[in-house]
């Protein structure tokens, strides 16, 4: 009762100077969560009805997206802008309502003056929604192109009533325009939607615009206007937004859904194998590589996060179905994206087991931001497996309880890879805010509650995806990058006790999912972090050394280094950069407008960076692997593109980062296929191997054993 009274008193206070941001946050939270009474109270206090986030989203945007009709009405009656659009994706309030199938709200927005009537008209035609169609027509803002396109869509659905209605209001179509061949070639190229992680490839064949969308068959388009086309085979439409003499973006509508795609940095070269055509496997074998002394794989991506395992005898071919080169296979319960680590004859893995049994998991290239709503009791486990046999040496139940955050459909409650130095094994579980340390015999040495690490979609703080940054061990410290929805930081814990040694606040950093790396080289040690701003710290003290931007709004890939150059990449808007940074500099290293290099930056590009997989530097080349399997090979010294190919020629979806060993590169898809490619300036596929299960984790390699962790098993692979 006391708590309720205090809350009501606080709510009744007028908005004071300096409290505007907090009040705006409160209004947005109330709109997101459907709290009509609080929305009305805050508006009565004078809180700005269109108070926006850093991304331009207003309370009306969230209410329309969530389907809170009463709040939408209250906000509109309070003066909210029904045509507001966010500044990041450029999405209008109406489009968010339509995208989430909140049709009643969409009709209301149209009645209140929303001008994006063309979109509503097309959605109505695709869904057969006559009421929405009439609301769009009634605005008087629908254009002839949209009416003609809607008429085609309704006809494809054999909806005679809607076709008749559209026929009544659609002007007579002009003759099919003859598009100048030079304009068609302007449209040709590759376009990408980073959110959906899909690619559209447009080509000109016999004066006709043709397209392939990800892994679909080829579509041929007929022009509707100079800038819009329809594929008569299935009704797919594509429209071009032209700025000056360049294509700014395209809008593709197919199967009832629309999405925007932007041009890639350049049209894929003719060396890129078309999706769906498998690459031939080379018959030229690599010479046998000499085995060197066993080297551990102590953390995320192995030694110094390099992903390189030369001299460790990694197998080239295997097949789980036939048993070829499968040394062992061990079942692990639960769900985990964490990768295996290896020290000596032990393999360490973590997992989280849901008591509710919700194993919802969705692979592939899609843009769904939804979380898995499973906050049932879980148990978190750490396993030690025998490297030679796969037998479970020991298992420890780290914690039992309920996760305090949800997870993404492509994530787990055990995303972070453990780390070991041969005496300690450290694991992090963000959803319960727990860092634990065991010795190699499974004895608990310490555990520390660091607070729940709530990482999610920067655009909507209620969308939780799950913390995934892995701990690293460096000179007696456990370093943890904790970029969350609020209060981001990076900290170092004492490896022997878990005591916090230092903490650096990253006040302006949003959720990131990258693991940090300690550069060790001639210029001293630098702790490198990926994020919306790239930063380097002194790993001993936490003092910030330098910063670099701009960067993507979602950073996932781990920084890597080779030959005294640090490489960073990210693959999400507003820029998708690749940076090659020289260590040893201080301050703001950001390039001046138009520059691609400086004393601190060896080379860079603001397009072409990859999203989830961390790149790899190997034998003078930098390899970046996009989620869709597009492989780009750069000259690591100059940044010149050496080649681009589609891995295996068959597309697929990739989250695991590549590893390299003995002149070979290993790329493992979410579908469980590992494509082995010869390292060097020419693309050559050596083998395609499968385990037939979902793979999200990076492989680990040590002393003749290649270890692959699937959703269900850990495989030991050896020749």
Region roles according to the model:
Residues 20-55, 59, 132-136:
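N-terminal segments that cap or nucleate solenoid repeat domains
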Residues 23, 56, 89-90, 117, ...:
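Start-of-repeat signature of ankyrin repeats
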Residues 29-34, 62-68, 96-102, 123-129, ...:
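Ankyrin repeat A-helix N-terminal signature
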Residues 35-43, 68-76, 102-110, 129-137, ...:
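Ankyrin repeat structural motif
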Residues 53, 86-87:
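Ankyrin repeat boundary/linker residues
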Residues 167, 171-275:
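Peripheral terminal and inter-domain segments
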Residues 269-719:
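Noncatalytic, solvent-exposed loop/strand surfaces
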């Amino acid at each position: 009762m006391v708590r309720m009274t205090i809350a009501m008193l606080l709510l009744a206070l007028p908005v004071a100077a300096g409290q505007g941001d907090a009040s705006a946050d409160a209004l947005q939270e109330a709109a997101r969560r459907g709290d009509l009474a609080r929305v009305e109270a805050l508006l009565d206090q004078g809180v700005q009805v269109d108070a926006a986030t850093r991304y331009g989203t207003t309370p009306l945007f969230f209410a329309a997206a969530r389907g809170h009709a009463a709040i939408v009405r209250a906000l509109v009656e309070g003066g909210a802008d029904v045509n507001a659009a966010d500044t990041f994706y450029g999405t209008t309030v109406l489009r968010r309502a339509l995208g989430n199938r909140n049709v009643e709200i969409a009709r209301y927005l149209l009645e209140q003056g929303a001008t994006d009537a063309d979109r509503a008209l097309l959605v109505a035609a695709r869904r057969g929604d006559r009421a929405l169609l009439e609301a769009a027509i009634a605005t008087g803002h629908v254009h002839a192109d949209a009416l003609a396109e809607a008429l085609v869509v309704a006809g494809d659905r054999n909806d005679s009533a809607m076709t008749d209605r559209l026929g009544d209001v659609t002007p007579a179509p002009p003759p099919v325009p003859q598009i100048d061949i030079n304009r068609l070639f302007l449209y040709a190229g590759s376009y990408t939607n980073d959110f959906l992680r899909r690619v559209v490839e447009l080509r000109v064949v016999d004066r006709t615009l043709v397209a392939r969308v990800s892994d679909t068959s080829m579509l041929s388009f007929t022009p509707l206007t100079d800038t819009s086309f329809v594929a008569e085979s299935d009704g797919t439409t594509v429209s071009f937004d032209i700025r000056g003499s360049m294509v700014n973006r395209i809008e593709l509508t197919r199967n009832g859904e629309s999405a925007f795609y932007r041009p890639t940095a350049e049209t894929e070269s003719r060396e890129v194998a078309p999706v769906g055509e498998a690459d031939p496997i080379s018959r030229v074998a690599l010479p046998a590589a000499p085995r060197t002394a066993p080297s551990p794989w102590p953390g995320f991506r192995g030694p110094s996060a390099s992903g390189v395992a030369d001299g460790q005898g990694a197998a080239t071919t295997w097949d789980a179905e036939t048993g070829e080169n499968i040394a062992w296979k061990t079942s692990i319960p639960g769900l985990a994206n964490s990768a295996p680590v290896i020290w000596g004859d032990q393999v360490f893995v973590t997992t989280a087991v849901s008591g509710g049994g919700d194993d919802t998991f969705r692979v592939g290239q899609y843009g769904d931001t939804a979380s898995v709503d499973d906050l049932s009791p879980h148990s978190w486990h750490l396993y030690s497996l025998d490297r030679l046999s796969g037998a479970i040496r020991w298992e420890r139940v780290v914690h039992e309880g309920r996760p305090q955050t949800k997870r993404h459909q492509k994530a787990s409650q055990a995303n972070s890879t453990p780390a070991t130095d041969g005496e300690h094994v450290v694991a992090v579980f963000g959803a319960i805010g727990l860092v634990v340390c065991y010795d190699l015999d499974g004895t608990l040495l310490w555990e520390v509650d660091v607070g729940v690490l709530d990482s999610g979609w920067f655009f909507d703080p209620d969308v939780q995806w799950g913390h995934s940054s892995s701990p690293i061990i460096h000179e007696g410290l456990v370093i943890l990058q904790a970029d969350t929805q609020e209060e981001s930081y990076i900290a170092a814990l004492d490896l022997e006790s878990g005591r916090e040694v230092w903490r650096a606040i990253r006040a302006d950093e949003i959720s990131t999912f990258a693991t940090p790396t300690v550069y060790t080289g001639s210029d001293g040690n630098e702790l490198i972090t990926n994020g919306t701003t790239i930063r380097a710290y002194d790993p001993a003290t936490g003092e910030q050394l330098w910063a670099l931007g701009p960067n993507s709004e979602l950073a996932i890939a781990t920084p890597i280094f080779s030959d005294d150059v640090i490489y960073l990449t990210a693959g999400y808007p507003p820029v998708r950069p690749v940076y090659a940074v020289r260590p040893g500099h201080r301050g703001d290293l950001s390039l001046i407008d138009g520059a691609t290099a400086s004393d601190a930056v060896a080379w860079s590009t603001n397009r072409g960076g990859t999203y989830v997989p961390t790149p790899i530097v190997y034998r003078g080349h930098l390899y970046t692997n996009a989620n869709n399997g597009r492989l780009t090979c750069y000259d690591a010294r100059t940044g010149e593109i050496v080649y681009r190919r589609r891995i295996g020629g068959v597309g697929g979806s990739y989250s695991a980062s590549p590893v390299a060993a003995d002149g070979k590169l290993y790329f493992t898809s979410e579908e469980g296929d590992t494509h082995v490619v010869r390292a060097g300036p020419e693309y050559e596929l050596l083998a395609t191997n499968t385990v037939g299960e979902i793979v999200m984790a990076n492989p680990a390699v040590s002393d003749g054993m290649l270890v692959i962790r699937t959703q269900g098993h850990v495989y030991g692979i050896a020749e």
